[in-house]
């Protein structure tokens, strides 16, 4: 079968088109996986580009590789500049007798969270501060319309001093003190000064297990754990807000609450602290 190898340099390139070309899409609706393309061509390319795009994401100084051989298709961005930081990403398909296994990863280091949030429409979820994140997923794939069903992995993020829009913490604490459930939208008219934000999650079959989420703002420490479904966006999270005493710095027990509803319409239900 034919083989193609070499090095290509571009001024500007659409990386989304390359990733689509290396993805095993087939069927009448483009939902089933057609892996026969890995049997028809051997490919080994080194790519570089001064500028590049992948959907809404703009990158510069891109170095990437594309490989196809029997039973394997790989696209790796080994280095790129994005959101005023560095970015690496990869997409891999391993084809075996038992099926197709997909692996994907994204690692961003020392990026501008505000720029990331604006680009992806996540200004309320991503702080305006410097930070890093890592996403790794792997698992069997049968159809594109159910691509996430078998994927498992981790997502973690760490952001430093900055701000988080859409959070009025004093109003939130007052509502939890008053009792009765309320919509998070009711206490979203504010901007929260942020000292740091740390997030660690485990992903299994369309569920995000929030193992640890901690936000520190001045004397307040907000913690969350629980489940988030990214099919439907359902929420089941337990949280607390502790306040450190000014003289000792020790955190005193504070508000406890449950977060339910969905990502688009979360609600808060205050919880009674155990005696």
Named regions from a protein language model:
Residues 201-210, 214-221:
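Extended serine/threonine-enriched, polar tracts that run as long, contiguous segments within proteins
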Residues 195-199:
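Short, intrinsically disordered low-complexity segments
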Residues 1-76, 82, 87-192, 203, ...:
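Membrane-proximal interfacial segments on either side of biological membranes
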